[in-house]
């Protein structure tokens, strides 16, 4: 996909003769592992730690220079082989071609008119690289012994990719040789480019991603050099940080969840050919057909011959796109910033507020979102703020009063205020909090816009500045929206306007918005706990997408798909202490605002 292609592409084969001994690198990686496994730094110390880790990583990269294997020629030179391989193995290759679209990079272009909802692309399971195929590969023996590979399918998939890339006769060579040689994820940012993200919400996840990737590399370098089941891996003599960063980014930008063959659970997969599609706003139009055992994609809209074919990756913020996919999407209708709010236990009404929130299914402390679109807050955040600002009398009404249950159900419905005073308080509170968050940035919106006019900015620097600008614009919109609502409800209160009456027939049931959704993103809109049942009809998948606005998300220029516990990115911390040395944590980059 698009913006990921670069000058040269990784190749299987042999690298340059090593000029540094494994023992020397082992000593450096041991130092790196120790540094990355230290407790989280205190407030204001994250940048210092990042620079220290980066210094060690750069020292390792310098000593390993020239050791990574590469493909000859350009990425696009191998596209014909990919199409031939895909066709011979049952994938659709008619009606589109791979083209460089400059701004968006490589993507698919229609060679004929394609109608909306027309099935135009399918890829059978045999072409997919999955955790299951990793288990059955040369990686299998090590996988069976290493708890980290077993616990983190994304890391297993990254090593599967590395092993197959280093095997000239790999079945997946036609796919692997068309992958980009490098990416625009923050793992590839120069230090000066990362500086542009300082004081943003995203910076915490950027630090976490870098630290966890370094920790994983340090851990697995030792494993590959010392574990008996790693002796036959083609990585034994050449496993560089550059290799691991590439594999991590390849998987992070492409991985998706699909059902296993028996349909009993989900697994991670890389989907050749299909992952060339670029992103636009819309609905999920890809599903997995268990009957035919293949990934299927229908057209998001009408595409005329000569037009680029887009798909929708999912309802992700630009922070998620930049960090996990390496691109910034202008006019992202699902963009948002995080805001962490909680009821203080020192609040004398804490117990009552906690009980009302519990009945509404909302925790007393949570990460919410302020959205790019109107309204800026979800039903869940509205309900939380209403409870947060309730008086003792209002709390009693929601716990013990007449129609208490109905009152709970309407907490998230903007049509039925608790009271005019409550509305004034909650919008005042939100206005103040968003204003405070805006003040934490080191630059203004106007300054960011001015910097973006600099023609000498790198692609990654521009992406970083756009991200911090986007965060501020969302917060500024929230401030203006909150101020407008505050004045409206203040006027209603002054005029002593009657509160809207509600009836059972028009109760607005509390539900999470897209922005606050934590449902797993799966090819077929399945929740892992429920298991995978009959294959979804494509039209049913589209219909369901309209309701849930969640489902399959695409690869290369896309977000990592699947449940957050397994593959939100390659750097998520596992639940078991035993594997902490190599697992990464997914810290929520939030600004905690607690009353």
From Swiss-Prot:
Chain positions covered by the region annotation Disordered: 1-22, 549-595
Reactions it catalyzes: L-histidyl-[protein] + S-adenosyl-L-methionine = N(tele)-methyl-L-histidyl-[protein] + S-adenosyl-L-homocysteine + H(+)
Enzyme Commission identifier(s): 2.1.1.85
UniProt keyword annotations, A-Z: Actin-binding, Cytoplasm, Methyltransferase, Nucleus, Phosphoprotein, S-adenosyl-L-methionine, Transferase, Ubl conjugation
Main localization, broad class: cytoplasm
Subcellular location, record wording: Cytoplasm; Nucleus
Residues that, per the record, bind S-adenosyl-L-methionine: 75, 104-106, 254, 275-279, 325-327
Composition bias, Basic and acidic residues: 574-583
Single Gene Ontology BP annotation: actin modification
Phosphoserine PTM positions: 513
Comp. bias (Polar residues): 10-20, 549-573
GO molecular function: actin binding; histone H3K36 methyltransferase activity; protein-L-histidine N-tele-methyltransferase activity; transcription coactivator activity
Main EC class the enzyme belongs to: transferase
Disulfide bonds: none
Family (UniProt): Belongs to the class V-like SAM-binding methyltransferase superfamily. SETD3 actin-histidine methyltransferase family.
Role summary: Protein-histidine N-methyltransferase that specifically mediates 3-methylhistidine (tele-methylhistidine) methylation of actin at 'His-73'. Histidine methylation of actin is required for smooth muscle contraction of the laboring uterus during delivery. Does not have protein-lysine N-methyltransferase activity and probably only catalyzes histidine methylation of actin.
Subunit structure: Interacts with MYOD1.
Domain notes: The SET domain specifically recognizes and binds actin, suggesting that it does not accommodate substrates diverging from actin.
Name this protein carries in UniProt: Actin-histidine N-methyltransferase
